[in-house]
Curated annotation (Swiss-Prot):
PANTHER family: COSTARS FAMILY PROTEIN ABRACL (PTHR46334:SF1). Belongs to the costars family. It holds the Pfam family Costars. InterPro entries: Costars, Costars_dom, Costars_sf. It comes from the Eukaryota. GO terms for biological process: regulation of actin filament-based process. This is Costars family protein ABRACL.
Length: 81
């Protein structure tokens, strides 16, 4: 699977699992994304896909590396609709 395809899938999953904030942008907690069965089956390396999407300025989140448990409450925000 190529990175662009995985990033597009990630955008769809953020929309599916997240909610739209007052700013009109979708966001989801990292823990929700990480724990979802569909996401677990879609992404071999979720953190790598998140980093690629952040580098492309499609999403944003605080920090550089997200770890299960430690960063479960970090918001992943979709910048592009």
């Amino acid at each position: 699977m190529n990175v662009d395809h995985e990033v597009n899938l990630l955008v769809g999953e953020i929309r599916r699992l997240g909610s739209k904030g007052n700013d009109g942008k979708f966001s989801v907690k990292f823990g929700v994304l990480f724990s979802d069965d569909k996401c677990a089956n879609l992404f071999e390396a979720l953190v790598g896909t998140l980093k690629a999407a952040k580098k492309r300025k499609i999403i944003t989140y605080q920090g550089e590396l997200l770890l299960q448990g430690v960063h479960d409450n970090v918001d992943i925000v979709l910048l592009q609709d």
